[in-house]
Amino acid sequence: MKKILLLIMTLIVSMTTFAQSDIVSVADAIKIFQTKTLYTGQQVLEKQGYIYKGISTDSYGKDHNWVKNMNLTKDFVPTAFAKGNSSMVQLDNTGKTVYVYVINRTAFAGLQAQVRAMGYDMGKAAKSSKGTLICTKDNQPTITFMTLQMPLPFCMQ
């Protein structure tokens, strides 16, 4: 019985690890945020298989966009999802914000586990809404996890 339980736990851990392996790590997202440069974003993300898709503009400003296992329409709406975990990384043109959007709930939970392992306080802020988790750590950037709507249901900011 113990062997069966051990086998099941091993399978769960390996599936969770696989679910996260093709998404940018939290440490890399923080590195991009701290350097605040397009060059660092390109170096880190393109080495991991992300493809640069250009600059999108909305009411909040301009963002540089990279995608993995998916494509974007000319309006930067996600389309053509491929095998594996689809994700999109946006770097605000001013370098003040990095967004990581994922489609898979397991990959989203994996990002949260990485933040927890880095020693962040995983508490909710007093004014946070349902589906928003604000994580803090001294002398480190604040990380926010948000549950949104399709086509990009999960976001780490």
Identify the role of each PLM range.
Residues 20-86:
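N-terminal leader/targeting segments
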Residues 56-61, 71-72, 91-95, 124-130, ...:
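Short, ordered beta-strand-loop transition motifs
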